Design a protein with these regions (language model features):
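N-proximal low-complexity "stem/linker" segments adjacent to membrane-targeting elements
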Residues: 1-46
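Short loop->beta transition adjacent to catalytic acidic/histidine clusters or analogous donor-positioning motifs
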Residues: 22-25, 46-57, 65, 77-81
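Acidic helix N-cap motif at the loop->helix transition within catalytic regions
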Residues: 36-39, 64-72, 115, 119
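A conserved acidic beta->alpha catalytic loop
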Residues: 44, 51, 59-68, 87, ...
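Glycine-rich, basic loop-to-helix element that forms the pyrophosphate-binding segment
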Residues: 85-102, 123
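Conserved nucleotide-sugar donor-binding catalytic segment
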Residues: 100, 155-233, 237
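Short aromatic/hydrophobic "clamp" motif used to bind/position activated sugar donors
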Residues: 107
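Conserved donor NDP-sugar-binding/catalytic core segment of glycosyltransferases
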Residues: 119-150
């Protein structure tokens, strides 16, 4: 019985290797009216010490010249791939479209205004391959306008299982890398906090996420809304994640919300 199961697993692995390219990292980037920053984002990918990647940029019906900027890069380097959506669909749908077209065994996420440090892919891929991890993330920093204007560094745990992750989203989307051999259903919901929901759904399968204790990415902060307003809205969305997405009882949701608030207070140094 054990031998039969082992053969099935080997067959599944072989099928995945035929379907996806081993060692290739597919970078998923949704873009909407991103003309002001997307060149800097793409340049940070070009600067990576690990070069076996493809970057799938999904233009979500931008009204500026985002598509033209991306196309100018794609014309020079075939690793850049532009996908134009016919109608504005939101970041979750754009990411799903990119994932469906991705050829890599590894999936990484980078939004159109964020930046990676040059050793991000190399260090993270080594970390995953040496340990056999399916789900990893890294530390990152907030910056405003220019990458020299660092505001704070986000502290992350060394590892997270499902129950620990319910105490608050401590994983930055721009730092995540997933191994498709071990995680089959990588799909974003259209519900708010879609990245958090995906992490929870993956961890719910019994997978543990492991964090690299080093800042390898830069998250661009905006100032279109007040900080207090963002925090309140985020808390309301998190409550809906517990109740609607994860089907957690009111009492347990209140328990996890307490940790969510506490983690929010100590998240930044």
């Amino acid at each position: 019985m054990a031998e039969t199961e082992s053969r099935k697993q080997q067959m599944n692995t072989d099928e995945l290797r035929q379907q996806y390219e081993d060692g290739l990292v597919s970078i998923i980037t949704p873009a909407y009216n991103a003309a002001a920053y997307i060149a800097e984002t793409i340049e940070s990918v070009f600067a990576q010490t690990y070069t076996n990647w493809e970057m799938l940029i999904v233009n979500d019906c931008s009204k500026d010249n985002t598509a033209e900027i991306v196309q100018s890069y794609a014309a020079k380097d075939k690793r850049i791939k532009l996908i134009n959506l016919e109608e504005n669909s939101g970041a979750a749908a754009a990411r799903n479209t990119a994932i469906q077209n991705a050829k890599g065994m590894y999936i990484a996420f980078l939004d159109s205004d964020d930046i990676w440090k040059k050793e991000k892919l190399q260090k993270q891929l080594n970390f995953m391959q040496q340990n056999g991890y399916a789900f990893t993330f890294t530390g990152y920093e907030h910056f405003k306008e220019t990458k020299e204007n660092i505001q704070n560094q986000v502290q992350i745990p060394k590892s997270l299982n499902y129950k620990q992750a319910l105490k608050g989203n401590q994983i930055g989307c721009l730092t995540v890398m997933l191994d498709r051999r071990q995680i089959r259903n990588i799909n974003f919901t259209t519900q708010k906090q879609e990245d958090y929901i995906l992490w929870l759904n993956v961890l719910k399968q019994g997978i543990t996420a492991y964090g690299i204790q080093e800042s390898l990415a830069l998250y661009r902060t905006g100032n279109s809304k007040s900080i207090s307003g963002n925090k309140l809205q985020s808390a309301l969305w998190t409550w809906k994640v517990y109740r609607e997405s994860q089907n957690i009882s009111v009492v347990k949701s209140m328990y996890y919300m307490w940790f969510y608030v506490m983690n929010g207070l100590k998240k930044h140094r």
